[in-house]
């Protein structure tokens, strides 16, 4: 074994992969190190008490170790294995996993164990990755803080009194706490990118349709997209290459070749962006953004120019209406998708007392007990927006705005290769700070939502600290040009790492139970 357990959990996936292929370390050793790390820092039983990260909802100790031993045996037998074989990974609890609980962070699916794997999970198994368990999330991906999970909040490893972002805060926090080198998230309006921003990690929302949604529990079907999360741009690219591709089980899947995202990341790591035109979105870098966030963003623009990129400012005039349109489209689609959860076939079932209990009574009792406040709020909003007499005024109008936003992006990409902005207007705020002000919470996704409306790919990567907390920079590219994200992201990462003297996450403070 070439590294101690405390060292192994800090290795990135690319380094782990090289060590595994060279026989310097076994998959079982790597997996056990990460399971021990989870046991040490993740929950009340870890010794970390109430300040545990709580990134995971379910940890599959036995299954992960058995899988790792099988990978080691296959490697010893000379079997041909994928580049990430033996590398551990966490999966957001919105993707179905055969034999493992899948709750989507809701009581409504409490105790449900799916009989099948999502296509993304199937691809992970085929590539030889070791699934450690399922990560925490806001209920049915409705939230920006992971405070709306029915199974407890997740804490930000940079400061356990602060949010890790959402809805996929568990996937991001697991990376920042060195509980896993890779995770899978899903992004409906920023649920991969916003948590990445506030935890100092990297997250990518691929082009809509580039990664299969089969087995992804739907929130808003025209917006949802699974994607890769990691601590480095290259690791994110390696995972992206595993999960992307056409899937006949998903009618929205794109039947097109996957861009060479790994090659783009390696090219970008040279730090050379000569000939690349970068657009700064005027509407996403001004009013409403914290001064520290804007300062780190401006410093990043300086680094992009130093790398040889041409940086120009441009306007997307209709993007200011994206947030309002999104919060009509999303609850409308969610109210339809969540109608299937009624306590009849799977998950929670609440039977009222009485001799003659009807199916309707069971549905009412189950949904009242099973859905949390935020889910109920959005179901009611969506049902209203779709109701007779209001459909055209609300949902129909929102879809027209969506088209205008898409056209703005099309026009912008006619003159630049990528667009950049801060990922989030603030750094991570205190747990509970915005629970009673949902509109303020929703505004945290103002920069990420437009990409979902347009179906374009987006990346968040760390660009510095403000008040000791991570700041994220967002890179956007045209549809099916996901490779551009990785070239620009890797170039900026390389320059910033040189400036900082190492990755930003090397500066994450230690706290109770979380030293590595």
Curated annotation (Swiss-Prot):
Superkingdom of source: Bacteria
Enzyme Commission number(s) from the entry: 6.3.5.7
UniProt KW Calcium keyword: no
One GO term describing the cellular component: glutamyl-tRNA(Gln) amidotransferase complex
GO function term, MF aspect, one: ATP binding
Catalysed reactions listed for this entry: L-glutamyl-tRNA(Gln) + L-glutamine + ATP + H2O = L-glutaminyl-tRNA(Gln) + L-glutamate + ADP + phosphate + H(+)
SUPFAM superfamilies in UniProt: Amidase signature (AS) enzymes
Active site: 92, 167, 191
Role this protein plays: Allows the formation of correctly charged Gln-tRNA(Gln) through the transamidation of misacylated Glu-tRNA(Gln) in organisms which lack glutaminyl-tRNA synthetase. The reaction takes place in the presence of glutamine and ATP through an activated gamma-phospho-Glu-tRNA(Gln).
Family named by the database record: Belongs to the amidase family. GatA subfamily.
Protein's name in the database: Glutamyl-tRNA(Gln) amidotransferase subunit A
Gene: gatA
């Amino acid at each position: 074994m070439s590294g101690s357990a405390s060292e192994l959990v800090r290795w990135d996936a690319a380094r782990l992969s090289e060590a595994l292929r060279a026989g310097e370390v076994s998959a079982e050793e790597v997996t056990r190190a990460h399971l021990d790390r989870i046991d040490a820092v993740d929950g009340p039983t870890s010794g970390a008490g109430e300040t545990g990260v709580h990134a995971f909802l379910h940890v599959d100790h036995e299954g992960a170790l058995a899988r790792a031993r099988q990978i080691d045996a296959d490697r010893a037998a000379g079997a041909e294995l994928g580049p990430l074989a033996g590398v551990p990974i966490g999966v957001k609890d919105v993707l179905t996993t055969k034999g493992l609980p899948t709750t989507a962070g809701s009581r409504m699916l409490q105790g449900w164990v799916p009989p099948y794997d999502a296509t993304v999970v199937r691809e992970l198994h085929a590539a030889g990755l070791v699934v450690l368990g399922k990560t925490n999330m806001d209920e049915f991906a409705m939230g920006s803080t992971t405070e709306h999970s029915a199974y407890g909040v997740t804490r930000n490893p940079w400061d356990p009194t602060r949010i890790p972002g959402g809805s996929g805060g568990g996937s991001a926090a697991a990376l920042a706490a060195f509980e896993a080198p890779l995770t899978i998230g899903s992004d409906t309006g920023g649920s991969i990118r916003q948590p990445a921003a506030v935890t100092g990690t990297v997250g990518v929302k691929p082009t809509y349709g580039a990664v299969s949604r089969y087995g992804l529990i739907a929130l808003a079907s025209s917006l949802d997209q699974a994607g890769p999360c990691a601590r480095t741009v290259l690791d994110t690219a390696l995972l992206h290459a595993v999960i992307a591709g056409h899937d006949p089980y998903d009618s929205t899947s794109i039947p097109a070749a996957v861009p060479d995202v790994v090659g783009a990341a390696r090219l970008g790591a040279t730090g050379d962006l000569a000939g690349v035109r970068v657009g700064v979105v005027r509407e996403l870098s001004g009013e409403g953004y914290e001064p520290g966030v804007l300062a780190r963003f401006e410093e990043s623009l300086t680094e992009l120019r130093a790398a040889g990129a041409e940086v120009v400012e441009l306007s997307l005039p209709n993007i200011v209406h994206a947030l309002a349109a999104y919060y009509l489209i999303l609850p409308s689609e969610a109210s339809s998708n969540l109608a299937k959860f009624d306590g009849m076939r799977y998950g929670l079932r609440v039977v009222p007392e009485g001799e003659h209990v009807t199916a309707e009574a069971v549905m009412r009792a189950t949904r009242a007990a099973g859905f949390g406040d935020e889910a109920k709020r959005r179901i009611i909003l969506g049902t209203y927006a779709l109701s007779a007499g209001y459909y055209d005024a609300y949902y129909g109008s929102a879809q027209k705005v969506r088209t205008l936003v898409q056209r703005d992006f099309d026009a912008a990409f006619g003159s630049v290769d990528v667009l950049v902005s801060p990922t989030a207007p603030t750094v991570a705020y205190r747990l509970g700070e915005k629970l009673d002000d949902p509109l303020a919470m929703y505004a945290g996704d103002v920069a990420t939502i437009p990409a979902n409306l347009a179906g374009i790919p987006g990346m968040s990567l760390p660009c510095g600290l403000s008040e000791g907390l991570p700041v994220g920079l967002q890179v956007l590219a045209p549809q099916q040009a996901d490779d551009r994200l990785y070239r620009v992201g890797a170039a900026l990462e390389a320059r910033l790492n040189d400036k900082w003297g190492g990755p930003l996450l090397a500066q994450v403070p230690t706290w109770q139970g979380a030293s590595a």
